[in-house]
Amino acid sequence: MNDKIAWITGAGSGIGEHTAIQLSEEGYTVVLSGRTRESLEKVSTKCQGDPLVKILDVSDPEEVKRVFTEIIKEFKKIDVLVASAGINTPKRNWHNISHQDFDKVIKIDLNGIFYTNQLVLEKMKEQKSGLIVNISSWAGKYVSTLTGPAYTSAKHAVNALTESINMEAGHFGIRACAICPGEVATPILDKRPIPVSDEDKKKMVQPEDCAKTVIFLTQLHPRVCINEITISPTWNRDYVSRLTDQIPS
């Protein structure tokens, strides 16, 4: 066991859930944040050690500050932040996305990462160490109509935000990495305008695959910073759609 503390947002499902479980198995004390207590409590039963549940809407800066303050009061430090909270909206393209939905996606997917990162960053500067992992997306690197302008814009910004941490705080011993997964079989797929088949989901990257990538980052020597990681399914639907008539049977 170690005495390290990891705070995971979006811990109630998907990548956040599996990251919390795997970090706890590595000996971390995990703090699980998300909007739904029932989901977080369920995840906590799968974690090793003594996980702490903190209800949080990352789009509310005052709520983020409150939870951060409570974590520091309890543990005095945060060694790893995994910012995994994210959403998209079913009506997501230019012809049908509302102002309200656009703002909601930006507030959670971008502002929420900024709020958590900024607070944790200042504490990590005091500690002279720390790892920040922001769960971005394939859409943070490649513009796609599949994800729409709000999500794509937010994730591109997350990548830039993450690298700016390395530029400004690397000399404090702080490392930041944006993980950019392609299609991952998480609940966010259920928000797609066109449903994803179970057969296709099985071929996608799984949440536990992304979690293993986070574990890899935590195991690197502190002198090593992986700025960005792009992950995609071997059977990549984006590639397949372009090669439909050329793929050998």
Q: What residue spans do the PLM features occupy?
A:
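Conserved glycine-rich cofactor-binding loop
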Residues: 12-14
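Conserved glycine-rich Rossmann-like NAD(P)H-binding loop of the short-chain dehydrogenase/reductase
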Residues: 26-42
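The beta1-alpha1 cofactor-binding region of Rossmann-like NAD(H)/NADP(H)-dependent oxidoreductases
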Residues: 55-66, 99
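Substrate-binding pocket helix/loop in short-chain dehydrogenase/reductase
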Residues: 92-94, 98-104
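Active-site helix of classical SDR
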Residues: 117, 154
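Residue(s) in the substrate-gating loop at a strand-loop-helix junction
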Residues: 137
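C-terminal helical subdomain
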Residues: 178, 198-239, 244
